[in-house]
């Protein structure tokens, strides 16, 4: 037998090192598959238009104005939960918050789908990781449609792979995590600064003074003008309701200014009394890019909302006093089967009853 040279020994040592490294990474990959982590994760530190499957490494640096780039799940969590991203901006905020809360409650890892990331990540510093489409399509999901209030059975869901659906937006799911939810829905700096710049430029009409108290007003119009009376036997916020809500704030706060946003700004200018000089029509009404109006509302001190999840989230994040439109459907409305007012509005919020006279007239034989 030929004696091994020093060169041969070095080559053999390098070969052993390479094989050991390959074996180590294969072990990690197989272990991740076995524990439900056979997932390709999209790092949501930027808007991804063509998702690719990558593994995020811990402690990846991120700028202060981006979403968290990698999963932040505690090691004790297991399984994989996600939720269908359905509806528009406010709907998807509700779905995100509910997924996060229920997954934590049940000790599961939460992931969002790329469509939800595309809706929310440009606006907020969200941290939930994104599930790659190929993983979504190959996972053996059990599906569960949620109703819009917390139920006891949702606290004990044993499914390791669960895909939720529905339009949950009730504080009963996530209010115990309010500070975490508010952190998830922190605006990116440029949106917050732009909104604050708009507010700084506002002046009270009669005195020219800079206001100290800002009341965000969200007036939902658009498709709800037909949907509410025709499908749900309901109404949207009227000019009389808005006047009463504004008077409520005028009676309790010194010289407030009302910052009006809506997807029907023309109606607002024609129907909201601005003669006192304290009403500012600041919204741009662009439904395709709602984040400017939303950012403006969240930077106000208080909120007047009409109906809809957009107004709910503006009020929830702004804090302060909130006035909402109450009893906006007839008692026999099918809407009340899927909507519980006590689960939709925080107990400390103030409700002003809607005027249903137009609906009673239509209901008469």
Curated annotation (Swiss-Prot):
One of its GO terms (biological process) is olfactory bulb development. This is Galactoside alpha-(1,2)-fucosyltransferase 1. The gene is FUT1. The chain crosses the membrane at residues 9-25. Residues 1-8 are cytoplasmic. The keyword Secreted does not apply. Pathway: Protein modification; protein glycosylation. One of its GO terms (molecular function) is alpha-(1,2)-fucosyltransferase activity. It holds the Pfam family Glyco_transf_11. It is found in: Golgi apparatus, Golgi stack membrane. Catalyzes the transfer of L-fucose, from a guanosine diphosphate-beta-L-fucose, to the terminal galactose residue of glycoconjugates through an alpha(1,2) linkage leading to H antigen synthesis that is an intermediate substrate in the synthesis of ABO blood group antigens. H antigen is essential for maturation of the glomerular layer of the main olfactory bulb, in cell migration and early cell-cell contacts during tumor associated angiogenesis. Preferentially fucosylates soluble lactose and to a lesser extent fucosylates glycolipids gangliosides GA1 and GM1a. Its EC number is 2.4.1.69, 2.4.1.344. Glycans are attached at residues 65, 301, 327. PANTHER family: GALACTOSIDE 2-L-FUCOSYLTRANSFERASE, GALACTOSIDE ALPHA-(1,2)-FUCOSYLTRANSFERASE 1. The keyword Acetylation does not apply. It catalyses: a beta-D-galactosyl-(1->4)-N-acetyl-beta-D-glucosaminyl derivative + GDP-beta-L-fucose = an alpha-L-Fuc-(1->2)-beta-D-Gal-(1->4)-beta-D-GlcNAc derivative + GDP + H(+); a ganglioside GA1 + GDP-beta-L-fucose = a ganglioside Fuc-GA1 + GDP + H(+); a beta-D-Gal-(1->3)-beta-D-GlcNAc-(1->3)-beta-D-Gal-(1->4)-beta-D-Glc-(1<->1')-Cer(d18:1(4E)) + GDP-beta-L-fucose = alpha-L-fucosyl-(1->2)- beta-D-galactosyl-(1->3)-N-acetyl-beta-D-glucosaminyl-(1->3)-beta-D-galactosyl-(1->4)-beta-D-glucosyl-(1<->1')-N-acylsphing-4-enine + GDP + H(+); a neolactoside nLc4Cer(d18:1(4E)) + GDP-beta-L-fucose = a neolactoside IV(2)-alpha-Fuc-nLc4Cer(d18:1(4E)) + GDP + H(+). It is a single-pass type II membrane protein. It is an enzyme of class 2 (transferase).
